[in-house]
Amino acid sequence: MESSNRSSNNQSQDDKQARFRGVRRRPWGKFAAEIRDPSRNGARLWLGTFETAEEAARAYDRAAFNLRGHLAILNFPNEYYPRMDDYSLRPPYASSSSSSSSGSTSTNVSRQNQREVFEFEYLDDKVLEELLDSEERKR
């Protein structure tokens, strides 16, 4: 009866710890990190053994981002995809108010000649054709 209580206690302790993608806990307490390499038919790529789960998870994130880029599923996505602040959303032609009047008129002209460009990824042909048709109808 005691052994079943011990195993349930160990299981509840494991559940309380944060679980990370690509990280396993070794019986002696260290954390191992590995990732599947898509270019080698899913073979395991050993990343190392670490003192903490967070270190192992960050090693996994670095490898995943290097292998899969923006398509990677990460443990800490905010470290690779920072939030966009207001200043990064400003267009490049939004200059300070100290610019001369001649500079502001050229800025106004360039604003009129610019048009918005949206970049879409992984859209099927039908959606792209509809977008192009709607742009042609506007003209």
Curated annotation (Swiss-Prot):
Its subcellular locations are: Nucleus
- Matches recorded under InterPro entries: AP2/ERF_dom (IPR001471), AP2/ERF_dom_sf (IPR036955), DNA-bd_dom_sf (IPR016177), ERF_plant (IPR044808)
Disordered: annotated span: 1-25, 87-112
**DNA-binding region(s): which residue ranges?**
19-77
Q: Which cysteines are joined by disulfide bonds?
A: none
Q: Please classify the protein's predominant subcellular localization into one broad category.
A: nucleus
Q: Biological process GO annotation list?
A: ethylene-activated signaling pathway
Q: Which organism is it from?
A: Arabidopsis thaliana
State which gene encodes it. ERF098
Q: Does the keyword Transcription regulation apply?
A: yes
| Function text | Probably acts as a transcriptional activator. Binds to the GCC-box pathogenesis-related promoter element. May be involved in the regulation of gene expression by stress factors and by components of stress signal transduction pathways.
Molecular function terms from GO: DNA binding; DNA-binding transcription factor activity
Protein name per its UniProtKB record: Ethylene-responsive transcription factor ERF098
* SUPFAM superfamilies the record matches: DNA-binding domain
Q: Give start-end positions of Low complexity composition bias.
A: 1-12, 95-107
Per the UniProt record, one Pfam family is: AP2
Indicate the family of this protein: Belongs to the AP2/ERF transcription factor family. ERF subfamily.
Subunit record text? Interacts with MED25.
Query: Cellular component GO terms, alphabetically?
Result: nucleus
